[in-house]
Swiss-Prot record:
Residues 1-144 form the MGS-like domain. It catalyses: (6R)-10-formyltetrahydrofolate + 5-amino-1-(5-phospho-beta-D-ribosyl)imidazole-4-carboxamide = 5-formamido-1-(5-phospho-D-ribosyl)imidazole-4-carboxamide + (6S)-5,6,7,8-tetrahydrofolate; IMP + H2O = 5-formamido-1-(5-phospho-D-ribosyl)imidazole-4-carboxamide. It holds the Pfam family MGS. Its EC number is 2.1.2.3, 3.5.4.10. Pathway: Purine metabolism; IMP biosynthesis via de novo pathway; 5-formamido-1-(5-phospho-D-ribosyl)imidazole-4-carboxamide from 5-amino-1-(5-phospho-D-ribosyl)imidazole-4-carboxamide (10-formyl THF route): step 1/1; Purine metabolism; IMP biosynthesis via de novo pathway; IMP from 5-formamido-1-(5-phospho-D-ribosyl)imidazole-4-carboxamide: step 1/1. Keywords: Hydrolase, Multifunctional enzyme, Purine biosynthesis, Transferase. The IMP cyclohydrolase activity resides in the N-terminal region. This is Bifunctional purine biosynthesis protein PurH. InterPro entries: AICAR_Tfase_dup_dom_sf (IPR024051), Cytidine_deaminase-like (IPR016193), MGS-like_dom (IPR011607), MGS-like_dom_sf (IPR036914), PurH-like (IPR002695). One of its GO terms (molecular function) is phosphoribosylaminoimidazolecarboxamide formyltransferase activity. The keyword Cell membrane does not apply. Belongs to the PurH family. One of its GO terms (cellular component) is cytosol.
Length: 492
């Protein structure tokens, strides 16, 4: 007669499943509450102690951790020496393990849970049996989800419980134990900081730190101000990522995950002035990131407007004294070393997406002039600055820039010409030294025509549309210099 161990915290359907196993010539062994549930359902069930000849101890903490259990589960039936060793020790084979774990997640979800309660709901024997059975899936059936009970019985009845299906059950086990262990780590690790709320007051939120490296937002040193909010953290990360792209002194202002002004110059004070002038309305209540030390002169300028967060590699003591007069402003010191991590992930319903970071760096030599007119040096400088910025703007993104600052930003529109219209409407200036920068190719020539009608004389875009030539012809018609990069910068 085959042997099955049943030990579940979720007892839904377990009596019916146990009865079906008996009908398939299984002998049932169980523990604690599961054994009582099966017995109360009228099923013949034996205590796990009859296998181990060892009584449960320490309030049930030790009951299945025994060679008579794990030897019977782990024995490779294809190895005669394993079977001989079992026989010598008087250990029987275990053919099925049905386990789901102590409800740790549900326990710690209670805001009044104590650490002692959490610890008592860390399952030890259950995961150990599951992992042992899953490792030996070729010979042992492992069931971790009640939703699989009916299918397992059906396959036992019709003889189709093959190795491929056993492997699918094995995968579910390791997914289950992985999630279980992750929940324990999340609860006990001191890397979780509760936030006042999420994007909106009706949403709870917390910040989980996976790194304390000084060049990351998680490793930043907060020098002043109240706790960062969920939105502060997201905007600060966007600002930090962009400002690190510049070697020369640079200032980046961000609002709702989009840059609203970017400036570069010989000094950080002048760079901030360019970023502020790029959009002196949207910067109000925003995040500012700077890649040089903030001294008193710049601090006095920053003090003059409402900002949520200021990020810099260093603040002088005099600058801190000036900015410290504003009670709520958050001041973050962060190492400006570029983050070389290669991947990023985003959660979606039921999982997450992982992708390589958009770290492609292009120089002028990597780009191609596709029009009759060549860009001027000033236009090249404008395009190179804009190309760094556009990768941080939500798609569809079209921006206008000169050599020292963004002059108009069109973000997040469902069509490219719409983004271009916004950038032009919001532009603080348009002249021969201003370039239009697009994160994606032009599907038709209407955006180029709009640029021409607005007085723009230089465009940089990825290229790659089947109608590229129409856009090039339109540029040539109006004497516009156009450059293609061969690289797209969509951002969602």
């Amino acid at each position: 007669m085959k042997k099955a161990i049943l030990s579940v915290s979720n007892k839904a359907g377990i009596v019916t499943f146990g009865q079906s196993l008996i009908e398939q010539n299984y002998e049932l062994y169980s523990t604690g509450g599961t054994m009582r549930e099966l017995a109360n359902g009228g099923l013949p069930v034996k205590s796990i102690s009859e296998l181990t000849e060892f009584e449960e101890i320490m309030d049930g903490r030790v009951k299945t951790l025994h060679p008579s259990v794990h030897g019977g589960i782990l024995a490779d039936r294809d190895k005669p020496e394993h079977l001989e060793q079992l026989q010598a020790q008087g250990i029987d084979l275990i053919d099925m393990v049905v386990v789901n774990l102590y409800p740790f997640k549900e326990t710690v979800a209670n805001p009044n849970v104590t650490e002692e309660d959490a610890i008592e709901n860390i399952d030890i024997g259950g995961p150990t049996m599951l992992r042992a059975a899953a490792k030996n899936f070729k010979h042992v059936i492992t069931v971790v989800h009640p939703a699989d009970y009916n299918e397992v019985i059906d396959k036992l009845k019709n003889g189709t419980l093959d190795e491929a299906y056993r492997k699918s059950l094995m995968i579910k086990v390791f997914e289950h134990t992985n999630e279980y262990d992750a929940a324990i780590v999340d609860y006990f690790k001191d890397n979780k900081e509760s936030l006042r709320y999420g994007e909106n007051p009706q949403q709870s939120a917390y910040f989980v730190r996976t790194s304390d490296a000084k060049h990351t937002l998680a490793g930043a040193k907060q020098l002043h101000g109240k706790q960062l909010s969920y939105n502060n953290i997201k905007d600060a990360d966007a600002a930090l990522s962009l400002v690190k792209q510049f070697e020369q002194p640079a200032a980046v202002a961000v609002k709702h995950m989009n840059p609203c002004g970017v400036g570069v110059a010989e000094t950080i004070d002048e760079a901030y002035k360019h970023a502020f002038d790029a959009d002196n309305q949207s910067i109000f209540g925003g995040i500012v990131a700077l890649n040089r030390t903030v001294e008193k002169s710049l601090a006095e300028v920053l003090h003059g407007i409402f900002l949520e967060v200021v990020i810099a590699p260093k603040f002088t003591q005099e600058a801190l004294e000036v900015l410290g007069k504003k009670k709520n402003i958050r001041l973050l010191e962060i190492d400006m070393t570029i983050d070389n991590s290669e991947q990023e992930l985003v959660s979606v319903s039921g999982g997450y997406l992982v992708q390589d970071k958009d770290n492609v760096k292009l120089n002028r030599e990597d780009m191609t002039v596709v029009t009759e007119v060549e860009p001027t040096e000033a236009q090249w400088d404008a395009m190179l600055l804009g190309w760094k910025v556009v990768a941080s703007v939500k798609s569809n993104a079209v921006i206008l820039s000169n050599a020292k600052q963004t002059v108009g930003i069109g973000a997040g529109q469902m069509n490219r010409v719409g983004s271009a219209q916004i950038a032009i409407e919001r532009a603080i200036e348009i002249n021969d030294d201003v370039a239009m920068v697009s994160d994606g190719f032009f599907p038709m020539d209407d955006t180029v025509e709009l640029a021409a009608n607005s007085g723009i004389k230089a465009i940089i875009q990825p290229g790659g549309s089947i109608k590229d030539q129409e856009s090039i012809d339109m540029a040539n018609k109006h004497g516009i210099a156009m450059v293609t990069t061969g690289v797209r910068h969509f951002k969602h």
